[in-house]
Regions:
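Patatin-like phospholipase
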Residues: 18-25, 30-134, 140, 146, ...
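Active-site periphery "cap/insert" segments of enzyme catalytic domains
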Residues: 130-164
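Short, flexible, glycine/charge-rich loop motifs used to bind or transfer phosphoryl groups or to couple energy/partner
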Residues: 12-15, 44-45, 153
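Small-residue-rich anion-binding loops in enzyme active sites
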Residues: 1-25, 160-161, 165-170, 176-180
């Protein structure tokens, strides 16, 4: 898809006729990822901004891949819809999480999981065992969601350059993956 930007009604006074090309860096962390979705949604509303490249890690990498896939299929509106679909599916999946507030927490208005028996048990186990020991089947609910929402062929050939950083847990060295190298 050709990357063009039309003049927006919200275009800032005195800005050039050409769109402003921007690059984004998106950090990891589930709540940061959800927050970033809102920021990305707002940026994608602006015709005078054009995202040229995105670097990301963890939740930031997922946002980057979802945005790039959507953008490659239908521009900014499709990217916004892809991000909304992704985060809606993540939210729907969280309904079945064992990490829920107890009825007493709900009654008392406490939002923290600090007293959740399941959270405390998993937290203790994660300090003793590797996540791979606790998940021998290698299940990850995000895999199915990403497979459904992201078209990696479109990402590979898309107009937005992606740079996803991952760390090798054995060596501690980082590696940057680019568009054609990205998979789940």
């Amino acid at each position: 898809m050709a990357r063009t930007a039309s003049t927006s009604k919200t275009k800032r006074a005195g800005s050039a006729a050409e769109p402003l090309l921007i690059d984004l860096a998106l950090q990891g962390g589930g709540s940061h990822g959800a927050f970033s979705w809102g920021v990305l949604d707002r940026l994608l509303e602006e015709d005078w901004l054009l995202i040229e490249g995105i670097s990301g890690t963890s939740a930031g990498a997922m946002n980057a891949a979802v945005l790039a896939s959507g953008f490659a299929s239908g521009g900014a509106p499709a990217a916004r819809e892809a991000l909304a679909t992704f985060w809606r599916k993540v939210s729907d999946g969280a309904r079945f999480s064992p990490f829920q507030r107890s009825p007493l927490d709900v009654l008392m208005g406490r939002w923290s999981l600090d007293n959740s028996p399941m959270f405390l048990a998993v937290d203790m186990m994660s300090r003793i065992f590797s996540p791979y020991d606790l998940n021998p089947m290698g299940t990850n609910p995000l895999t199915a969601i990403l497979s459904e929402v992201v078209d990696f062929e479109r990402v590979s050939n898309g107009p937005i350059k992606l740079f996803v950083t991952a760390t090798n847990v054995h060596t501690g060295r980082g590696r940057v993956f680019r568009n054609p190298e990205l998979t789940i």
